[in-house]
Amino acid sequence: MDLGTTKYIIYTELIADGYVEKHDVIGAIFGQTEGLLSNELDLRDLQKSGRIGRIDVDLENINGKSFAKITLPSSLDKVETSILAATLETIDRVGPCFATVKITEVEDIRVSKRQYITNRARSILRKLMDEMIDTYEITEEIKESLRTEEIMEYGPENLPCGPNVVHSDSIIVVEGRADVLNLLRCGIKNTVAVEGTSVPKSIMELTKKKTTTAFTDGDRGGELILKELLQTCDIDYVARAPYGKEVEGTSKKEIMKCLRSKVPVEQIVGNTCNDACNVSKVIEDTPKEIFEPVTHKYYEKVETPVIEPVFEGPVVEEEIVVVEPVKKTETEIIDVDATNEIQADRKFSGVKEIVDSIKNTGNVKFVVDGTEKTNTFKEFLTNIHEIKKMDFFAADMPISQKIVDLLYDKTPIIVGKEINVTKKPVNLRLFSFDEIVA
């Protein structure tokens, strides 16, 4: 059915009590409506002028009855179409048979067309929006191409690196090329990749010259690379991607957070690679202010203690040298012989027993108001803000400058596996395990 300029379609059902044919139905429509209305609404004249379309009849004969579905296109207005539809229901005979006619629907073709237009326009717009590249995407695409061009190669192994690796005072060591590219997207240009678990010699040499941060994935592979780096390179800081994530898939916000929370190697629990691999958890559970450097006005340089040979016989204590200030200030007393400090601290009740109890455990033990407490170093750091004063602190780990800065105003005595500090307050006494058990 060619709709052309059709505005409405009249759908009609006809039931005849006997057997009739299609031309009988068409004849009844024209014959029984003729003269009912004015000449302006005569079906023959309307059809000749093209204001109504071709009448379509779909007829079936079942059990001696005839059932027909009639469609009549109309380009008349709404009122005239309604009058024409009502006129069709006046048909009561088709050929020799009685018949009934009922209008089932008058469809507004323009509504259907509007719905089609709406749906099609939505589809076209969606396609256009999918294909359209906005200004932001164009900018990012250009930046991405420039960043890709910024990737350089370092050393005889042609390792992927950022453009500032050679000239920067500090570098970030990552796993692969994709990690370098992701950090370039974040504006970080002093990165270099090891390209595998076997650390190249050029990386080993580079870490000796520059402040180095190892930034590895938050998975098992990242742990293996971190172990290798700690064993072969001079690493100063360690940062880990969020647990289960890779550096190349980490967002800019997460990368910046990880790098800001990097942990000095000395702060990692113990002195083993397995402990180092838990640094991401240490970072999450440790308050930021713990890692801030502390400057104290009463610092003195720590000189290497000279241990005099011990001879049999009565112990003769060395004379304590008192440095008198020019002005009237507090007297600063500096022990000349570290052996005397060891002997003095042996008077502290149970020091040797405390040291023996935490050896090879990685734990710390401290005394608060005469009560001994044992924790892991991570638990101790978490609860450090609750501790005001300690009588004594011992840790099964090297004592670094960071630990001294953290505890100098909380305890007068610190004992550790090793003492690796450059300066200490004069009122703080530091001893290694070997000095305690000697």
Swiss-Prot record:
Binding-site residues, Mg(2+) 2: 217, 219
UniProt keyword terms in alphabetical order: DNA replication, DNA-directed RNA polymerase, Magnesium, Metal-binding, Nucleotidyltransferase, Primosome, Transcription, Transferase
Enzyme Commission number(s) from the entry: 2.7.7.101
Highest taxon above the source species: Archaea
Cofactor entry: Mg(2+)
Binding site for Mg(2+) 1: 175, 217
Known partners and oligomeric status: Forms a ternary complex with MCM helicase and DNA.
Name of the protein described by the UniProt record: DNA primase DnaG
